[in-house]
A protein has these predicted regions:
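Structural preference for solvent-exposed beta-strand-turn elements
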Residues: 1-150
């Protein structure tokens, strides 16, 4: 929703065991889809960041669509679960997404106390960051890299 990308995800997995594989595989598939959709990345903004405030929580995200898949996440979530969702899976999603989208992603909680708010703000920050980084900028001629490829 916050990235304004026109997509719907329907994921089915072995959730009777746990949601780890389903969440990670969803990150992998979305990452691959972004990598494919961006093609040679000509004309994209490439770099972006966003900060999302949600009550007591503040989370920032920054991205470089660099061709190098890596994520750095500092999301200390105070509880192990939000409902039935294992909170550490949020970070696993971001790692898988960044690796397979071939981008560098930083997600950091600057303030927070409510686990639900922290995770929701993180996903919203990443969505807005991806929207901005993927946007075509008419001022960018060709691929936004001195190397000529990303």
């Amino acid at each position: 929703r916050h990235g304004l990308f026109d997509l719907t995800v329907h994921a089915v997995g072995d959730v009777e065991v746990d949601a780890h594989h389903t969440v990670e595989d969803t990150g992998i598939v979305l990452g691959e889809a972004f990598c494919h959709a961006l093609g040679d990345k000509a004309g994209i903004t490439r770099f972006a960041d966003a900060a999302i405030a949600m009550d007591e929580t503040l989370v920032t995200a920054a991205v470089d669509i660099s061709g190098r898949g890596q994520a750095y996440c500092e999301l200390p979530v105070p509880t192990e679960r939000v409902g039935s969702f294992d909170t550490e899976l949020a970070v696993e999603f971001f790692y898988a997404f960044a690796r397979d989208a071939k981008l560098t992603l930083h997600v950091r909680e600057l303030a927070g106390g409510n686990s639900h708010h922290i995770i929701e703000a993180a996903f919203k920050a990443v969505g807005r960051t991806m929207r901005r980084a993927c946007e075509l900028d008419p001022r960018v001629q060709g691929i936004p890299s001195t190397k000529g490829s990303l």
